[in-house]
């Protein structure tokens, strides 16, 4: 590498950055993004995201330690609850979900890079326009509930472990104070009971954070930053096989507790990277 190139890319700075700050393995933060390609653009969107954006717009960035992409075919979309959702209108919108882990304590550092790199990608014509962000937010990790205690994969393994499915759950409380009560109830009572003997190996719980003011304009500002919780259920079975016994009625259980309301319960299966599998099953 020439001296000019090293100077242009600030190569010497990387050694300084690597020597300071948190560098654990826990997912202290997440990017959770549910997107709907516009009709007729399904194949092109899928190839753009998998061949370019998943890497250049996410995984190549500092402190983003893991990523996994998920898809909801039409039959999975039709399982979603509730019929009228504050998150997705219609509730079937958002057939692709991508989840990323960000190293604990590195949120601010990562955000500076992600805003800059996405502006660069946009300037260079590497942003696909024919898509809608249905639910996109960076999130702070609150808790993880494990079915099998200390045995099995941890949350930092979750996006690399070959789970057969994932369920995205979004719960809204009425106030910040009620959200704290909701979190306590979920972690200490509701989730341990739900995962016991179920195909769900773990549930991670996050709270959304506001996007920076200089974010890309095609991503709307995050709603519910003081009142919302986002849950990811990692399943060892196809969600179609376990939906009725384990997830039907889950929204009613939250409502009955009087601590919030489920605004989205949506099942997904993992994509097969580098392929167009499932694209013909979205509509």
Per-range role (PLM):
Residues 2-283:
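Macromolecular interaction modules
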């Amino acid at each position: 590498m020439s001296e000019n190139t090293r100077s242009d890319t600030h190569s010497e700075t990387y050694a300084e950055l690597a020597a300071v700050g948190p560098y654990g393995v826990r997912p202290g933060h997440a990017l959770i993004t549910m997107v709907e390609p516009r009709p007729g653009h399904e194949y092109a969107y899928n190839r753009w995201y998998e061949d370019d954006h998943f890497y250049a717009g996410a995984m190549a960035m500092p402190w983003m330690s893991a990523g996994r992409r998920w898809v909801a075919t039409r039959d999975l979309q039709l399982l979603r609850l509730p019929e009228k959702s504050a998150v997705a209108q219609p509730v079937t919108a958002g057939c692709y979900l991508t989840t990323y882990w960000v190293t604990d304590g590195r949120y601010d550092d990562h955000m500076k890079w992600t805003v800059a790199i996405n502006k660069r990608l946009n300037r260079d014509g590497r942003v696909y326009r024919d898509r809608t962000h249905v639910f996109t937010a960076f999130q702070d990790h609150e808790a993880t509930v494990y079915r099998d205690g200390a045995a099995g994969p941890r949350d930092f393994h979750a996006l690399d472990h070959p789970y057969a499915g994932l369920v995205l759950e979004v719960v809204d409380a009425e106030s910040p104070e009620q959200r704290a009560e909701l979190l306590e109830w979920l972690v200490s009572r509701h989730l341990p009971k739900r995962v016991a003997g179920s195909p769900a190996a773990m549930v991670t719980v996050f709270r959304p954070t506001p996007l920076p003011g200089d974010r890309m304009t095609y991503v709307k500002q995050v709603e519910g930053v003081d009142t919302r919780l986002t849950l990811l259920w990692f399943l060892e079975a196809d969600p179609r096989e376990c939906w009725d016994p384990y997830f039907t009625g889950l929204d009613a259980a939250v409502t009955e507790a009087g601590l919030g309301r489920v605004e989205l319960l949506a099942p997904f299966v993992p994509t097969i990277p580098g392929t167009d599998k499932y694209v013909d099953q979205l509509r």
